[in-house]
């Protein structure tokens, strides 16, 4: 993981994602619904729900939208969703994982396959790609107006139980064992740190540079996947070239 900046790659795609706010709220509503359905509507006793609520707040999701999703979870007749992961390779042979919440596996499998193959990629069998990624807790602290140097930040992160930290001019990226994520987050919050992003994510063990002549095609593939209502997350091992 050392030397891999997830934040750099997120920022490389940020402008494209900013135009999808309505779609993001729709996906978050489904995540909130599922988390509340499985673990109850109280985030203090449901770590999964607290995590999704943090994501919703970071995305500036309206409180009414959050409330509607939680209220829906108490409806016994509301739809249920299956969690499904698809694996494949995008343009340039870059590994990708697609996580979905679906009420129709056949529909979602078909639309994911079309999005990947249409843009020069191919689907892969279960297990062909997932071993290249590790589940990690991921916390990002912006360096804007933060009077803490890298050494102090690293000391605080490790003391809280973090595994690793990456530093850029813009942010500190902190990685944790997924089981220790809540502990690390809470310990750093107690020290006054605020997060611009905090989530459980899939981190590639190694990055594959996206060829410059494939960047547009790769982005188009991700856009089509993320436009699918069933797709919740798209993870890639792609290293985006600097602008």
UniProtKB/Swiss-Prot annotation:
One of its GO terms (biological process) is regulation of DNA-templated transcription. Its main location: cytoplasm. Residues 1-23 are annotated as: Disordered. InterPro entries: Integrase-like_N, TACO1_YebC-like_2nd/3rd_dom, TACO1_YebC_N, Transcrip_reg_TACO1-like, Transcrip_reg_TACO1-like_dom3, YebC-like. Pfam families: TACO1_YebC_N, Transcrip_reg. GO terms for molecular function: DNA binding. It is found in: Cytoplasm. Keywords: Cytoplasm, DNA-binding, Transcription, Transcription regulation. Belongs to the TACO1 family. HAMAP family: Transcrip_reg_TACO1. This is Probable transcriptional regulatory protein LCABL_11860. It comes from Lacticaseibacillus casei (strain BL23) (Lactobacillus casei).
């Amino acid at each position: 993981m050392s030397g891999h900046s997830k934040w750099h790659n997120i920022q490389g795609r940020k402008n494209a994602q900013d135009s999808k706010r309505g779609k993001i709220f729709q996906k978050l509503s489904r995540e909130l619904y599922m988390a509340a359905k499985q673990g109850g509507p109280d985030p203090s006793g449901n770590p999964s729900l607290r995590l999704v609520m943090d994501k919703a707040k970071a995305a500036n999701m309206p409180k009414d939208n959050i409330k509607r999703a939680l209220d829906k979870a108490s409806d016994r007749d509301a739809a249920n969703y299956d969690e499904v992961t698809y694996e494949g390779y995008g343009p340039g042979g870059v590994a990708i994982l697609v996580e979905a919440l679906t009420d129709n596996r056949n529909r979602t499998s078909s639309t994911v396959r079309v999005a990947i193959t249409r843009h020069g990629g191919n689907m892969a069998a279960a297990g062909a790609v997932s071993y290249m990624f590790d589940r990690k807790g991921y916390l990002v602290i912006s360096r804007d107006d933060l009077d803490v140097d890298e050494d102090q930040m690293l000391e605080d992160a490790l003391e809280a139980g973090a595994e690793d930290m990456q530093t850029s001019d813009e942010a500190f990226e902190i990685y944790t064992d997924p089981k220790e994520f809540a502990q690390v987050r809470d310990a750093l919050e107690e020290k006054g740190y605020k997060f611009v992003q905090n989530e459980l994510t899939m981190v590639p063990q190694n990055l594959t540079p996206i060829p410059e002549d494939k960047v547009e095609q790769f982005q188009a593939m991700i856009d089509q996947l993320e436009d699918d209502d069933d797709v919740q997350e798209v993870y890639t091992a792609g290293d985006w070239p600097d602008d």
